Amino acid sequence: MKSVIDHIVVGAAHLDEGCAFIEETCGVTVPFGGIHEQFSTHNCLMQVGQERYFEIIAANPDAPSLNRPRWFSLDDEGTKRRLVGGPIALCWVVGVPDIQAVIDKSPVPLGTPLSLYRGDLQWKLTVPDDGHLPEAGLVPAFIEWPDGVNPSSRMPALGVTLDRLCLTHPEPQWLEDVFGTLDIEHLADITGGKRSISFACDTPKGKVLLR
């Protein structure tokens, strides 16, 4: 089974702010997904292609405090400062059949494969102990779903599709080599420059670059 883009993630300081941003930018209203009790976050979800989805995520202000940092760098002070300016393309997640095999061969520390849940959904995801995103989100998180099937078919298709995932890195060849080792070099366009991630999407409002 070839590695695939499982989902892309936009972070927001507040979930309603993230949804308003996507409604204004893409012309769609993304419905509520659910609550992640293990990380005190909540999300909104929609399909962006076959077996591929889009997540808006934010800290859940009504959740209890954690004894560890939230995932996706949401407790990182640098991320918090960026989110003050509005929602951002935060990271991407790659679906694999054997998450431990990916961790074992990765030249970049990916974190621990945590067993997670939301409602009746269960999955394993790489999460560093300090909650950071490897290479500021350019190196993806990896996810393993039971039977290799993600839940995108349960989400609404609102006319938004992911066209390209675009990454810039000060050492693009290094990043390409990392991706080659991880067998994901076919999933993203890499160019040289300051670290950044963006999602090129086709939407009801036309072509949009979320960054």
Where are these regions (language model features)?
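Conserved catalytic-core motifs of GNAT/GCN5-like acyltransferases
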Residues: 29-36
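A short beta-turn/loop motif at secondary-structure boundaries
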Residues: 36-39, 191
